[in-house]
Amino acid sequence: MTIQIFGTVCIDKVRKIEEFPKSLGTYTPVISEQILLGGEASNTFVCINEWVEKGQESIKLIVPPLVDDLNGKFIINKLNQSTGKTSDKNVIFTQIQEINNNNENNYLKYTPITDIYVCNKKERTMFGIGFPEIDQYMVQCKEIKEKILNVDLQFGPNHWISLDANYPLINREVIKKSIITNTNLYIMDQELDTVVDELSLENTSIEHTSNLIFQSSSDHFGNKDGPIKEFFNIMNQWFQKDNGIFKKFLFILTDSKNGFGIGGTWNNEWIEPYWFTPSAIPSDKVVDTTGAGDSFRAGLIFSLVHKNQSLSDSLEFASACGALNCLSIGGCSSTPTLNSINQFLKLNNKNQMFL
C-alpha cells in the first residue's frame, strides 16, 4: 500500500505581530520574521516522515511543479533535509521549470509563497501568491497533467491519495480518476459538488469506492466557536446533498481547539455524527496554529491508515499531533515526535501508541 500526499508545497514567510490593524491605512510593526517550508502537503508529509521507520518508501509526497528560482531551490533543499533519505524515493517532483519571463502564456513564473501574520491571540491570517497559476498550469499543460495522472500518482484499491484545496482544478481530475479506479481518498476542504456532478454526467458513482475521508473546518463551513448542535445540523445537511451521496464519506468537521464533529461511513459501516472533545494545549503555551489541521491529518493517516489502529484511538493520536504542532512557529518547522505525542496522551490519561 502506498500513501501519497499531493498538494500545496510552498514557502511560508511567518511574521509575528501584536495585533491586526483595526482600520485600513494604519501601521503595524512586525516583531519577527521566519522563512520556512510550508504548504498543507509539506506539513502533513514532514509530520508522517518523522514517525515512519527509516527506509520506509510507502509514504510519498508528490510535489506540484516548482520554478527553478531561489525560492524553488529553498523548497527542494528543505525537503531533502526533512526526509533524511534520497528524495527520489519519498519525494517526487512533478517538474522543476526553468525561469522563463519571455513567454506570456507561461503560468509557471514563480514558486508559490504565503505571507502568514500571527498575532498575540495566536490566530493567523494568510496572503498567497502563485497558487492559481500553478493549478491552471497543471491542467492546461497536457504533458504535466498526463505525468501527474499516469506516472507520479498510483491509483487502485491498495493506494491512498490525500489532497488539499489549493489546486481545485487538478484535484478534480485526480478525484475522478480515483473514483473510477476505486482508490482511497483523504480530501481536505476541496469543493466536491462539481466533481460529483461531473461523475454523474459520466454515469460514474462513488457508491463502491473504497474509503473516502473528508476533513474541513468552521473556517469553511461557518459557525466558528458556535454551538455544537449547529455543527450537527451542518453535517447532516451535507450528508443529505445530492440524494445522500456524501454519506459515503467519513466527515470530520473541526472547530479549532473546541473539538470536532465526526460521522459518516468508515469500513462500510455508518457512524452517527458525534462530537469529539480533544485534550488541548493550555492557551498560554500556544505559539502558532498554522498547520494544526495538517498535523491532525498526518496523525490520522499514520494511525488509522498506515498502522491500521481503531478509529477512536486514531482520533486521539491525531488530536495530540494537531495540538502539539501549535507549540512552534510554522506548519512543519518542529513537528511532534512519537515520544512527545505519547507523553501528551499519558498526561491526559489516553492510550499510548507506537511505543
Curated annotation (Swiss-Prot):
Cellular component GO terms held in the UniProt record: cytoplasm
Keywords recorded for this protein, A-Z: ATP-binding, Carbohydrate metabolism, Kinase, Nucleotide-binding, Transferase
Entries under InterPro entries matching the protein: Carboh/pur_kinase_PfkB_CS, PfkB_dom, Ribokinase-like
E.C. designation(s): 2.7.1.-
Name of the molecule in the record: Uncharacterized sugar kinase
Family: Belongs to the carbohydrate kinase PfkB family.
GO MF, one annotated term: ATP binding
Biological process annotations from GO: fructose metabolic process; regulation of glycogen metabolic process; response to fructose; response to glucose; response to insulin; response to sucrose; response to zinc ion
Taxonomic lineage from the root: Eukaryota, Amoebozoa, Evosea, Eumycetozoa, Dictyostelia
Segments passing through the bilayer: none
Gene3D superfamilies found in the cross-reference section: 3.40.1190.20
Lineage top rank: taxon: Eukaryota
Cysteines joined through disulfide linkages: none
